[in-house]
A protein has these predicted regions:
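Active-site neighborhoods and metal-handling regions in enzymes and metal-associated proteins
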Residues: 1-592
């Protein structure tokens, strides 16, 4: 099937005199997770991971993805004729180098400029120009092959009340216009759906697990417009737009509107697609959108709400842990059935809307695939042995959650116990960090990796990511990683109100996977002659499975942290449990 699709794509390439065609994982808005309409890379390659770029040449094809997906991609690409390129590994070429190496002068590279951000497109152009290669950015060739392509979504919107958001649309627009004045630009083009959702206190369900509407916006010093189908707007949102003089235009009208912009226009090249920038008559000012940082700095209302969302989520996951530990080996269960059980328990919580991403429910060796997704063809039964890794989260009106626990269901090996403890040590060390204001996540990442690096072991992904507020579960700019990646903006200072995940792990192919994840918020600590100190407070409250620990490997300080954390878990979660569940939780949170 994949070979047939690639063959049809090559026929279209020949018709358009294209020798290389790039299929990124993206949509018109540079969204991390895309709706079915934009699942072009998945359709053409069969690889279902959330990140990857497919390059099809006339005689071969290759797919690039990161360390989260090496094992999964190798399995899913087998027999497809598509070579796996493990990004960042020795000897693996960059995408542009691969293209240049395999094409000859005056050949043409094609892609759909609507699904390529400007920064990436200009980087390709720079390399291709040097190699005397042409670039055609107006080709949606996958659309010509994908005959039963789904429709663009157009779900009803809902107004996100200030009771949850903590700031009015009027205030946000005022802040944005003040930024434009300060930077001496006349307008800004916004295409990131999460930024637009934040700015207009607007939510919808266009993308599974990501409560946003596909839309564009242009804001100037005098006016504002949003580009989406007006028929899908709820009454409160329409009133909000009217009160703030926001004009509603058709979704596809953005290209006429951007072409008509005069004066200086601010464009974030990392998010605005290349087709829009190519369409501008005005000279763009390339600069990061200020909304990226503004929405990462949660206000008091957002923090109050998200703390309550995490209590509710903690209740659901703790109830699940009780059920799982009690019933493993006694009743029939599988990866897919326990995943459904967890979703059911979440759905019983007030103001639950949906999961915040597709749950990773991975038993034994499946957990070595960091982002494994259980499907009927891979689903396995769960018994009272080994470990079960579940990475999951919920979208509540009060906020977004993300948690991973590795559950011990029976006997485990000494190797598994050793690495379970080492990974938890890393989690504790980062959780307990005190640091001077001015640090970024890159300064602190070693705390989480240290216990693993001491043994020459690593995990091939970041330690943590920012988390949105009833928005995307992966939110920039804050995060934890050890390596500076120029295309990512993670050098930002960790500031008060930023929420970041903390999720070190160990992954042994063919054997097991372990991950321990909480969300944490940055708070101010003491200020003295050395400066302003900061630290983290946990938002996630679910016990770590003490059945996996080798306590002898923990320092006294680490044991104290874990005991204090578990005491908090019991105090915050037990009031919402049955007497049997609370009694079990007391044991699960026992002092070590």
């Amino acid at each position: 099937m994949i070979k047939e699709r690639i063959s049809k794509l090559r026929a279209k390439m020949l018709e358009n005199n294209v020798q290389a065609y790039i299929v990124p994982t993206s949509d018109f808005h540079e969204t991390e997770y895309v709706c079915d309409y934009f699942a072009c890379r998945k359709y053409m390659s069969g690889f279902t991971g959330s990140a990857g770029v497919l390059v099809v040449l006339l005689d071969k094809a290759a797919l690039w993805t990161d360390g989260r997906y090496f094992i999964q991609a190798a399995s899913q690409l087998e027999g497809s004729g598509i070579d796996l390129m493990k990004m960042g590994q020795p000897g693996v070429p960059e995408i542009d180098a691969y293209i240049v190496e395999n094409l000859k002068e005056n050949d043409t590279v094609g892609f759909d400029g609507r699904v390529m951000n400007t920064k990436d497109a200009l980087a390709y152009k720079s390399v291709l120009d040097l190699a005397h290669l042409n670039m055609n950015v107006n080709l949606d060739l996958v659309n010509e092959v994908w005959t039963d392509r789904p429709q663009l979504p157009s779900t009803p919107t809902f107004h996100y009340s200030e009771k949850f958001s903590g700031e009015s649309v009027e205030s946000k627009l005022s802040r944005l216009r003040a930024f434009l004045k300060e930077n001496k630009v006349d307008s800004i083009v916004l295409t990131s759906v999460d930024q637009i959702a934040w700015l207009y206190n607007l939510r919808a369900h266009d993308i599974p697990n990501f409560p946003v509407a596909l839309a564009y916006s242009i804001v100037s010093l005098e006016s504002a417009s949003i580009y989406m189908d007006a028929s899908r707007l709820d009454e409160l949102s329409l009133k909000e737009f009217k009160d703030n003089h926001v004009t509603v235009c058709g979704y596809s009208d953005i290209y006429l509107a951007t072409k008509a912009i005069t004066g200086s226009v601010l464009v974030d090249p990392s998010s605005v697609n290349y087709a829009i920038v190519s369409n501008l008559q005005a000279k763009p000012v390339f600069k990061e959108s200020p909304i990226i940082l503004w929405k990462a700095l949660k206000n008091d209302t957002e923090l109050k709400c998200t703390k309550w969302a995490h209590i509710k989520d903690g209740v659901a996951v703790t109830k699940f842990m009780y059920w799982l530990k009690k019933n493993a080996g006694k009743i029939e269960m599988s990866e897919m059935s326990v995943q459904s059980k967890l979703q059911l328990l979440r759905s019983e919580q007030e103001n639950y809307l949906e999961d915040s991403f597709d749950t990773i429910c991975a038993y034994k060796e499946h957990a070595a695939m960091m982002h494994y997704s259980s499907k009927p063809e891979t689903n396995v039964d769960i018994t009272n042995s080994g470990m079960l890794l579940i990475d999951s989260g919920g979208q509540y009106l009060e906020g977004t959650t993300d948690i991973t626990r590795t559950f011990v269901l029976g006997d485990i090996s000494e190797e598994e116990r050793y690495w379970f403890t080492k990974a938890l040590r890393g989690h504790i060390r980062l959780s307990d960090a005190h640091f001077l204001f001015g640090c970024s996540g890159i300064n602190l990442d070693i705390l989480a990796r240290g216990p693993l690096w001491d043994q020459d072991v690593d995990y091939q992904c970041g330690t943590g990511h920012g988390v949105g507020h009833l928005l995307n579960v992966h939110e920039s700019p804050n995060g934890f990683r050890w390596k500076v990646l120029p295309h990512r903006n993670e050098m930002c200072v960790l500031d008060e109100g930023m929420i970041t995940s903390n999720e070190p792990g160990v992954y042994c192919e063919g054997k097991f996977g372990i991950r321990h994840e909480n969300e944490m918020v940055v708070v101010k600590g003491n200020v003295n002659n050395y400066g302003q100190f900061m630290h983290f407070e946990p938002l996630t409250f679910v016990p770590f499975d003490l059945d996996g620990l080798d306590v002898s490997l923990l320092t006294n300080e680490e044991k104290a942290w874990l005991n204090n954390y578990h005491q908090e878990v019991f105090e915050k979660i037990s009031p919402y449990l049955t007497s049997d569940e609370a009694e079990w939780l007391k044991s699960a949170c026992r002092s070590i």
